[in-house]
Amino acid sequence: MNGVLQVTFIVILSVEFIIGIFGNGFIAVVNIKDLVKGRKISSVDQILTALAISRIALLWLILVSWWIFVLYPGQWMTDRRVSIMHSIWTTFNQSSLWFATSLSIFYFFKIANFSNPIFLYLKVRLKKVMIGTLIMSLILFCLNIIIMNAPENILITEYNVSMSYSLILNNTQLSMLFPFANTMFGFIPFAVSLVTFVLLVFSLWKHQRKMQHSAHGCRDASTKAHIRALQTLIASLLLYSIFFLSHVMKVWSALLLERTLLLLITQVARTAFPSVHSWVLILGNAKMRKASLYVFLWLRCRHKE
């Protein structure tokens, strides 16, 4: 592969890592600081904090695994190490995806307006809905790990019986199995986020029709709340789509012999979601936006001194 392209992608990955660590670190520090001071943090801030911490761990894991792959490719390709690393990666990746999806569900129930009795029933029991979502994500995570590890155990047994060819078969099948399983289970939270976005758009459309003859101020307040949430969800879904497509590309890249460039592209695409999305959340959250402005003004004053 062209050395210039490789260096370019590595630089992009490094920038994404720095942006992601600072963005997610900022979210975590702001909320943990309030918690230490004895202030009560809201449900959305609790989700944001859990999301930020899981993404910090995920970004560090991406960086470490990538450098191990580049510097020690032979050691990286041993079946047991591949399995352990992918299991750890799946843990933080699934946590990140489901916390982001929980955030979409939270915004949907807080802002959307429907007269449907099921919606109203769930809206007044939002805390239970969020707990149920996290329990479901835990069940799906366990299934994901089982599906990834079961074929590996079979392949290792085959390797012990016939050492002549099973190692190649092992690595090839494992390289296809992990991204396929993560793509399959990653589609579920993506689909849930997409549904909440579509329903929120429909809610805004219904609201605008219903409030045409209502007071202008009330209409503007609710419409602005819908639009702010939709702006955040649009940016989130765009990054989510790139992330999901990168998993599809990784499944396809497992079939190729010369795949270094494609692996770099998919890695850059995958890292964009936990990295850039943190700043989307900061700009879309009033508390985080205010805190970031305070930090910016403080840094500006320090620079002038």
UniProtKB/Swiss-Prot annotation:
Keyword field: G-protein coupled receptor, Glycoprotein, Membrane, Receptor, Sensory transduction, Taste, Transducer, Transmembrane, Transmembrane helix
Protein name from the UniProt record: Taste receptor type 2 member 116
Function: Putative taste receptor which may play a role in the perception of bitterness.
Keyword GTP-binding: no
Cytoplasmic side: 30-55, 123-128, 206-236, 283-305
A Pfam family of this chain: TAS2R
Glycan-bearing residues: 93, 160, 170
Organism, as annotated: Mus musculus (Mouse)
Main localization (coarse): membrane
